[in-house]
Structures are given as C-alpha cells and as structure tokens.
C-alpha cells in the first residue's frame, strides 16, 4: 500500500462489532478502508459502511477460517495478491441484503447451527481452521429445535416449522459448497 502512495493505519479489532463501530466513527477520514479478516469481520465493516451517507472505497484481504465470500467473488487466496487487487482498484459490485434494519453481505440465517461461528472459540479457529466449526456444530446436535416462521416473497407465502433458513449471496456457507 505504501508503495502505491497510501498512508497506512492499522487497527486490530478487539471484540465483536468493534469493526462496525470503528467504521461508523472514522470512515469519513479515509479514501479507502481495507478489511483483512474473515467473513464475519467483512460483514461488520460493510454493516458500518452502510450506515454512512458517503462511503470510502472498500478493499478486502481474506484472512479468516473459511473465506466463503472471498471465494464467491473470486478474490485470490494469497493475502499479497488480494492486497494487490485492493490497491489496483479492481472494483466489483455486490448485493447488500437487508434483514429487518440490519444489513448483510454474506448471509442472514436463523435456526440450527447459526450460532456456531460466534460460539467457536477464536483459539480453536486459529489452530484448526474450518474443522473447528464442525466440532462446535456437533456439540449442538442434541439441542436442535424448530422455529415457526412465515416467509413472504414476491409470488406467495410459506408458513411452517423450520429447522434452518438462510438468505445468502455466496456460493458456499461455512466452507460447504453446493448448499446454497
């Protein structure tokens, strides 16, 4: 970034929603914000940007356990190559979803296993990567329950008991391809 004339300021997030709050309060000071993290960190940054009337350019360097969203938009797996994409300005448009008043770029879901990404200890994710999520999901098997839900869409309505529901714009969720 420095070689391309950018002044770099680094902020390591400290807790959940930290990235969103920092973006809301400080984004106006920057021409570009580059998020380096996983799907959750990216979602926080974008959620913060969506609350602003004027938004800086967003770059993304995937550095999480699964990086589903980055795969979907075909970002390089190499952090150096992804940084090059951010610096050289290859822009793409992505859909931003809404779930009530909340915005999301990757997934909005309810039901079985939706808390797994939040409940999996960071240390486990750092050591095991994607398998850490699977281990955490297995611990949830005995507490599965259904949710009564009514879903309205353009051509109708579906009502019933659901174990899981999601809306996503990714080709994979939780590292699993083909379930979207």
Predicted feature descriptions by range:
Residues 40-42, 67, 173:
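Glycine-rich nucleotide phosphate-binding loop and flanking beta-alpha elements
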Residues 166-180:
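Internal helical hairpin/lid segments
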Residues 1-36, 43:
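ATP/NTP phosphate-donor binding region
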Residues 19-22, 46, 92, 136, ...:
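A generic local structural motif
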Residues 37-38, 64:
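A short acidic Gly-Thr/Ser loop motif
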Residues 44-46, 70-71, 176-177:
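Short glycine-/acidic-enriched loop or helix-start segments at secondary-structure transitions
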Residues 11-13, 51-167:
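Catalytic core of DAGKc-family lipid kinases
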Residues 41-53:
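Short Gly/Thr/Asp-enriched flexible loops that form oxyanion-binding sites at enzyme active sites
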């Amino acid at each position: 970034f420095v070689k391309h004339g950018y002044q770099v300021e680094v902020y390591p997030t400290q807790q959940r929603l930290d990235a969103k709050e920092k973006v809301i309060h400080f984004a106006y000071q920057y021409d570009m914000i580059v998020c380096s993290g996983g799907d959750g960190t990216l979602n926080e940054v974008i959620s913060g940007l969506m609350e602003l009337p004027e938004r800086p350019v967003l770059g993304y360097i995937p550095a999480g356990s699964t990086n589903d969203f980055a795969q979907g938009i075909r970002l390089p797996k190499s952090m150096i190559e992804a940084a090059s994409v951010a610096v050289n300005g290859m822009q793409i448009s992505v859909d931003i979803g809404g779930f009530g008043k909340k915005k999301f770029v990757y997934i909005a879901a309810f039901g079985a296993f939706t808390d797994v990404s939040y409940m999996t200890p960071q240390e486990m994710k750092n050591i095991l990567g994607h398998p850490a999520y699977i281990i955490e999901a297995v611990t949830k098997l005995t507490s599965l329950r259904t949710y009564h839900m009514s879903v309205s869409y353009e051509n109708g309505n579906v009502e019933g008991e659901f174990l899981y529901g999601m809306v996503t714009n990714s080709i994979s969720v939780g590292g699993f391809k083909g379930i979207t």
